[in-house]
Amino acid sequence: MLLEEVHAGDRLSGAAARGDVQEVRRLLHSELVHPDVLNRFGKTALQVMMFGSPTIALELLKQGASPNVQDASGTTPAHDAARTGFLDTLKVLVEHGADVNAPDGTGALPIHLAVREGHTSVVSFLATESDLHHRDATGLTPLELARGRGAQELMDILQRHTVAPL
């Protein structure tokens, strides 16, 4: 990787992590930095962005950022948005092709992470998009995970969307 590419990746990732929409736009449009350029840590701007800023996600995705880029542990931006509870950002990612059925390195789908963290609105959104029969590395479906946590509201949401396998 060229030093200037790393520098561009650091600048774009830094602006995305700070939530600096204007700088992200300037780098993408004026300096023509590729949205998937890697920073010095091997991450893209979409992977390190401020997840509370769906505008940043939208700008990067409109310019061609991959919504399904995985880090070394298999985590995608959708996993991060679900884990941290940023529903608006997650919706933008899904609208631009994020695969909510891609497991991370622990076998967890984004919905598993949302259940684990107790993000009701994220679980409700993902319940219609996710494979609710998928088991993580511990062998649990999202519903079983919610049951183990004693999270009745999450269990109710998941039960409404779970169809018995044939």
UniProtKB/Swiss-Prot annotation:
One of its GO terms (molecular function) is cyclin-dependent protein serine/threonine kinase inhibitor activity. GO terms for cellular component: cyclin D2-CDK4 complex; cytosol; nucleoplasm; nucleus. Interacts strongly with CDK4 and CDK6 and inhibits them. ANK repeats lie at residues 41-69, 73-102, 106-135, 138-166. Belongs to the CDKN2 cyclin-dependent kinase inhibitor family. This is Cyclin-dependent kinase 4 inhibitor D. Keywords: Acetylation, ANK repeat, Cell cycle, Cytoplasm, Nucleus, Repeat, Tumor suppressor. GO terms for biological process: autophagic cell death; DNA synthesis involved in DNA repair; negative regulation of cell cycle G1/S phase transition; negative regulation of cell growth; negative regulation of cell population proliferation; negative regulation of intrinsic apoptotic signaling pathway in response to DNA damage; regulation of G1/S transition of mitotic cell cycle; response to retinoic acid. The gene is CDKN2D. Interacts with CDK6. SUPFAM superfamilies: Ankyrin repeat (SSF48403). It holds the Pfam family Ank. Signal peptide: none annotated. The modification N-acetylmethionine is found at M1. Coiled coil: none annotated. It is found in: Nucleus; Cytoplasm. Its main location: nucleus. InterPro entries: Ank_Repeat/CDKN_Inhibitor (IPR050776), Ankyrin_rpt (IPR002110), Ankyrin_rpt-contain_sf (IPR036770).
